[in-house]
Amino acid sequence: MQDNQPNPSPEPGSLAAGPSGRDDKNQRYWFHILAQNTHAARNLHAAKLVDKAWQQGDRVCVLCDTEEQAVELDDLLWNFTPEAFIPHSIAKAATTPCSDPVGILLYPPAAVDWDTVIVLSSALPEDADQYRRLALVAHNDPAVLNQARGHYKQLRSLGIEARVHDMRK
């Protein structure tokens, strides 16, 4: 017996939703500014974004500055929640590309390889306007916020007005 109730609408960005069809590239770029001022809070927020994007069928990478930062995020993703399993690995160089659905990269990601790019790095890749989706996560630390301002200006110079989710308010 078939259920005659209509299926609920798929989540935006999910595979079931198909291509977004959005012409406005600004809808794909977000800044997340956290109220907390710790690296741990930043990593936790990034892990939540990874989980959400991966659950929607995206291939996700997180761009980190250091191996220490990558290892911290790696540990967090393995222990994110008891019921979660996020298949991922660390890729230290472009010569050893990541084949997992989620990658923690120590080098700028190629836009064609990833659906969602999450930046924890101090440097925004030059081709940031080529990514399908881009999220930048900053915790409430003066140096990190200054980097975020630079990233925002860089995106504006590429013609992108990123959405800002300021959680300090």
Language-model features and meaning:
Residues 30-33, 59-65, 117-119, 136-137:
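Short hydrophobic beta-strand segments
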Residues 43-96:
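Short, well-structured hydrophobic secondary-structure segments
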Residues 37-39, 68-70, 110-112, 123-128, ...:
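Short acidic, S/G/P-rich loop/turn micro-motifs used as interaction or catalytic elements
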Residues 95-130:
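Mid-chain, well-packed structural core segment of small domains
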Residues 21-42:
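Glycine-rich phosphate-binding "P-loop"
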Residues 13, 17-22:
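N-terminal polybasic/positive-inside topogenic patches
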Residues 132-169:
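Glycine-rich, aromatic-bearing surface loops/beta-hairpins
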Residues 1-8:
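N-terminal acidic, proline/glycine-rich, low-complexity intrinsically disordered segments
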